[in-house]
Amino acid sequence: MANVHHISVPSKVLFQKARKLVPPMLEKFHKGQQGRVAVIGGSLDYTGAPYFSAMASARLGCDLSHVICESSAATVIKSYSPNLMVHPILPSSASVKDPSSIDAPSLASPIIAMLGRLHALVIGPGLGRDGVTLKVVTEVMKEARSRSIPFVLDADGLLLVTENPDLVKGYKDCILTPNVNEFSRLAKALNIEVPSLAQISSKESGDKTSKEAEACEKLSQALGGVTIIQKGPHDVISNGVTSIVSDLPGGLKRSGGQGDTLTGSLGTLLAWRAAYHDALWDSGEQEHSKEAENKEEVQGELESNKRMSPSTTLLLAAWAGAAITRECSRRAFKAKGRSMQASDLTDEVHESFLTLIGEPEGSKVPERL
């Protein structure tokens, strides 16, 4: 891995450090401080994906989980769970008089008005490819970026980046979660040469990961340091400066919708990350003001009791989200085998969190029976 800035930190150490990002359960907190996350997606054809993503956010532990969707999807998503706040304010061609002539900033204004109340966005689950919808979401992304609101992009949210990489280029508070096909399309759009599946498959296990990490790092660099989770047998995570691999065992069933558990988990982890950097509680770490700028400094923060800088916490949040999702998949597959569905992962989010990360010191939670 000569060209890859890969770090190797034991999973146990990473989970201990990830626990530092988790707000303890304390009487002093009020509603919303432990995370306000919104999923932007949900259309006539796709209602499951935003639900699975928003429920993963809720089950991991955010206080308020929103879905911003097209009106055609709202009632369906509401019927799935009363725990989600569903807002039918995402325009589509069916909801405007003249789809060929729209004022996208004006149509986006109801969504933009919500941004001040949110810690993180998940953009893409069930979004679809309606032209009006994508133009409106583009405006929302621009505004979120201008306000430094972190967001996760998946599915058709990634299509927007493929068509206009400048939307995220250089934005360090963004996580992309492409599968192998989405990764290839992004790489092609940015003229990044990546090894084919056949080339990767012909390599030994360690070399496969090396090739994937190198490609992931190159794509991140081309996007100016955006964090990328390249999903696969091993999840490769890179911000262009530092790369890390999530290789916990997962399930073997490749049913659709499992990536929505990842995006929702990431949404909550990004919200917790914001609370961590706002110092809403004492993490017990030594104060440390220097930003980690290279692989060695990131690894140093992860392996010490120093307070982490934003670049380190973003990489750690991405790794933790991937690890939790893999554990959800493993548990669900063990219970359901070939019949496993995306909803089975939702049921495993909390137990997976407790098994891998656990409640932080000082949390006042009831003892388990």
UniProtKB/Swiss-Prot annotation:
<dbReference type="GO" id="GO:0005524">
    <property type="term" value="F:ATP binding"/>
</dbReference>
<keyword id="KW-0547">Nucleotide-binding</keyword>
<keyword id="KW-0520">NAD</keyword>
<dbReference type="InterPro" id="IPR029056">
    <property type="entry name" value="Ribokinase-like"/>
</dbReference>
<dbReference type="Pfam" id="PF01256">
    <property type="entry name" value="Carb_kinase"/>
</dbReference>
<feature type="domain" description="YjeF C-terminal">
    <location>
        <begin position="14"/>
        <end position="356"/>
    </location>
</feature>
<dbReference type="InterPro" id="IPR000631">
    <property type="entry name" value="CARKD"/>
</dbReference>
<dbReference type="GO" id="GO:0047453">
    <property type="term" value="F:ATP-dependent NAD(P)H-hydrate dehydratase activity"/>
</dbReference>
<dbReference type="InterPro" id="IPR017953">
    <property type="entry name" value="Carbohydrate_kinase_pred_CS"/>
</dbReference>
<keyword id="KW-0521">NADP</keyword>
<feature type="binding site">
    <location>
        <position position="126"/>
    </location>
    <ligand>
        <name>(6S)-NADPHX</name>
    </ligand>
</feature>
<dbReference type="GO" id="GO:0046496">
    <property type="term" value="P:nicotinamide nucleotide metabolic process"/>
</dbReference>
<comment type="function">
    <text>Catalyzes the dehydration of the S-form of NAD(P)HX at the expense of ATP, which is converted to ADP. Together with NAD(P)HX epimerase, which catalyzes the epimerization of the S- and R-forms, the enzyme allows the repair of both epimers of NAD(P)HX, a damaged form of NAD(P)H that is a result of enzymatic or heat-dependent hydration.</text>
</comment>
<feature type="binding site">
    <location>
        <position position="260"/>
    </location>
    <ligand>
        <name>(6S)-NADPHX</name>
    </ligand>
</feature>
<comment type="similarity">
    <text>Belongs to the NnrD/CARKD family.</text>
</comment>
<feature type="binding site">
    <location>
        <begin position="231"/>
        <end position="235"/>
    </location>
    <ligand>
        <name>ATP</name>
    </ligand>
</feature>
<keyword id="KW-0456">Lyase</keyword>
<feature type="binding site">
    <location>
        <begin position="250"/>
        <end position="259"/>
    </location>
    <ligand>
        <name>ATP</name>
    </ligand>
</feature>
<feature type="compositionally biased region" description="Basic and acidic residues">
    <location>
        <begin position="284"/>
        <end position="306"/>
    </location>
</feature>
<keyword id="KW-0963">Cytoplasm</keyword>
<feature type="region of interest" description="Disordered">
    <location>
        <begin position="284"/>
        <end position="307"/>
    </location>
</feature>
<keyword id="KW-0067">ATP-binding</keyword>
<keyword id="KW-0597">Phosphoprotein</keyword>
<dbReference type="GO" id="GO:0005737">
    <property type="term" value="C:cytoplasm"/>
</dbReference>
<feature type="binding site">
    <location>
        <begin position="179"/>
        <end position="185"/>
    </location>
    <ligand>
        <name>(6S)-NADPHX</name>
    </ligand>
</feature>
<dbReference type="GO" id="GO:0110051">
    <property type="term" value="P:metabolite repair"/>
</dbReference>
<protein>
    <recommendedName>
        <fullName>ATP-dependent (S)-NAD(P)H-hydrate dehydratase</fullName>
        <ecNumber>4.2.1.93</ecNumber>
    </recommendedName>
</protein>
